[in-house]
Amino acid sequence: MNQIALPLDWPADETDADFIVSASNAAAVRHLEHVATWPVWATMLTGPRKSGRSLLARIFVLKSGGTLIDNAEEQNEERIFHAWNAAQESRHPLLIVCDRAPPEWRPRLADLRSRLSATPAIRLGEPDDQLIDRLIERLLGARGIVTRPEFRAYVVTRIERSFIAVQRFVDLVDQAALARRAKIGIPLAKQVLAEMGVIDESRLLV
C-alpha cells in the first residue's frame, strides 16, 4: 500500500493464521502482542521485502484498532508526524512500516526525527529453515500443488535464505513443471535451483 489506509480498505478475513511465525520473526510478533509495554504509542516495523511485514501490520491494526503507515519513507513526513502525535493523544497504537529504521532512515523533518528517536523499532529477519519449509508448502499449496516433506527439505538445505529467493523458486518450479509436464519433486527442484543460481553451498548437508 502506498498511502495511510483505514482498516476498512483491507480484506476482513485476514487472521493470525495467515502469518507464519518462526524463530526469525517471533520477537517482532511478541512485541506487537504487548502494546501496553510500549514506551510510546508507536512502533516501527522493518524487514525484507516479501517478508510478510505488511500482512503482519494489517493483522495487528485490525486487532488493535490502531493506525498503519506502510512504506513510510515514501509518505509525506508531516502526515507521519501528525499521525504520531495523534496516536499519543488517542492512546491508539500507530505502526510505521519502513525499509530501514533511523538512523539509516533520516527524515528531513526535524520534529519527526525526534519522535522516531523515541519510537521502538522491531525487525523481521530473513527466513530460517522452518519458515522456508512452510512458505514453500503454503505458496505451492495455494496453486493446488501438494509437496512432500523430503522435497521441501531438499530445497531448504540448498536455497539462499531470502524471501525473494523462495518466491522466485516457487514461481519457477511451477512454471517448469507446466512447461516440461514434469512432476514437482527433487529432480525438478535440483534443475530449477541450478538454473536460478541461488544454491547456497555453505548450507549443504555433509
What do these predicted ranges mean?
Residues 177-195:
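Conserved C-terminal helix/linker of AAA+ ATPases
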Residues 20, 32-40:
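Phosphate-binding P-loop
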Residues 102-117:
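Short regulatory helix/loop adjacent to the ATP-binding pocket of P-loop NTPases
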Residues 119-131:
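Conserved AAA+ ATPase "SRH/arginine-finger" region at the nucleotide-binding site
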Residues 63-79, 83-86, 90-101:
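Conserved P-loop NTPase "ATPase switch" module shared by AAA+ and STAND
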Residues 4-26:
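Dynamic helix-loop-helix/coil hinge segments at AAA+ ATPase domain boundaries and subdomain interfaces
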Residues 40-56:
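Walker A/P-loop nucleotide-binding motif
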Residues 153-157, 164-178:
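C-terminal helical "lid" of AAA+/P-loop NTPase domains
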